């Protein structure tokens, strides 16, 4: 898992008015919470947030905070980014403090490898779950979970229970959940062949 640094500033004032002023000044308001600590209000540069979540790990990147007084050298992951509905610019960020020796729960993207045999025969790929909910130590968070679909035939699916996860990583989704499958040929294609 990628680990990066992010400069922040703590702030004592909170509320909608303060948040609007921060955004007008080109900063993002946020909060750091978790691990039995009182929530701490922060602000940061949008560029710093974008750099911290860049790369394949995205929101699961481990971020070491810099310049935040008591929060200096604290390791966090992004819990949530609230975005403007139209511009998609960050409006607020929630950061969750982690302990490197305690397990965390995160969503990790699924990456499909190969082309399903059933798709080559005219079937339709049904990629039902693009991410999986896992539990592991922060240092073991994978960037993605790879699933080889080359042998997947029409009418078959790969379920959570059939996926092999890296050592120390446990999927907490229902084992019977289908992640990816191949559906039969489209009706008009089947009718044309008949």
Swiss-Prot record:
Q: Please, which domain of life does this record's source organism belong to? A: Bacteria
Q: Which CDD domains match?
A: Ribosomal_L25_TL5_CTC
Task: Please describe the quaternary structure of this protein.
Answer: Part of the 50S ribosomal subunit; part of the 5S rRNA/L5/L18/L25 subcomplex. Contacts the 5S rRNA. Binds to the 5S rRNA independently of L5 and L18.
- Report the source organism: Trichlorobacter lovleyi (strain ATCC BAA-1151 / DSM 17278 / SZ)
Official protein name in the record: Large ribosomal subunit protein bL25
Matching NCBIfam families, A to Z? bL25_bact_ctc
Q: Which SUPFAM superfamilies does the record associate with it?
A: Ribosomal protein L25-like (SSF50715)
**Which GO terms fall under biological process for this protein?**
translation
User: What family does the database annotate?
Assistant: Belongs to the bacterial ribosomal protein bL25 family. CTC subfamily.
Molecular function as annotated in GO: 5S rRNA binding; structural constituent of ribosome
A GO cellular component entry from the record: cytosolic large ribosomal subunit
- Lipid biosynthesis found in the keyword field: no
Q: Does the keyword Ribosomal protein apply?
A: yes
- List the keywords (alphabetical): Ribonucleoprotein, Ribosomal protein, RNA-binding, rRNA-binding
The family database entries (PANTHER family) matched by this protein are listed as: RIBOSOMAL PROTEIN L25/GLN-TRNA SYNTHETASE, ANTI-CODON-BINDING DOMAIN-CONTAINING PROTEIN, RIBOSOMAL PROTEIN L25_GLN-TRNA SYNTHETASE, ANTI-CODON-BINDING DOMAIN-CONTAINING PROTEIN
Q: One of this protein's Pfam families, by short name?
A: Ribosomal_TL5_C
Function, in words: This is one of the proteins that binds to the 5S RNA in the ribosome where it forms part of the central protuberance.
């Amino acid at each position: 898992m990628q680990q990066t640094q992010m400069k922040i500033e703590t702030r004592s004032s909170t509320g909608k008015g303060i948040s609007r002023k921060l955004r007008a000044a080109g900063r993002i308001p946020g909060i750091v919470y978790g691990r039995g600590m009182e929530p701490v209000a922060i602000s940061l540069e949008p560029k710093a947030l974008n750099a911290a979540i860049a790369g394949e790990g995205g929101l699961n990147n481990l971020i070491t905070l810099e310049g935040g007084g008591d929060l200096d050298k604290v390791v966090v992951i992004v819990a949530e980014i609230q975005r403007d509905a139209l511009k998609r610019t960050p409006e607020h960020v929630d950061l969750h403090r982690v302990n490197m020796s305690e397990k965390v729960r995160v969503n990790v993207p699924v990456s499909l490898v190969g082309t399903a045999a059933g798709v080559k025969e005219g079937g339709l790929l049904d990629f039902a779950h693009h991410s999986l909910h896992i539990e592991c130590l922060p240092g073991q968070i994978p960037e993605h979970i790879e699933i080889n679909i080359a042998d997947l035939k029409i009418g078959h699916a790969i379920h959570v229970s059939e996926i092999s996860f890296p050592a120390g990583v446990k999927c907490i989704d229902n084992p019977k959940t289908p992640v990816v499958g191949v559906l039969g040929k489209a009706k008009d294609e089947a009718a044309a062949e008949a």
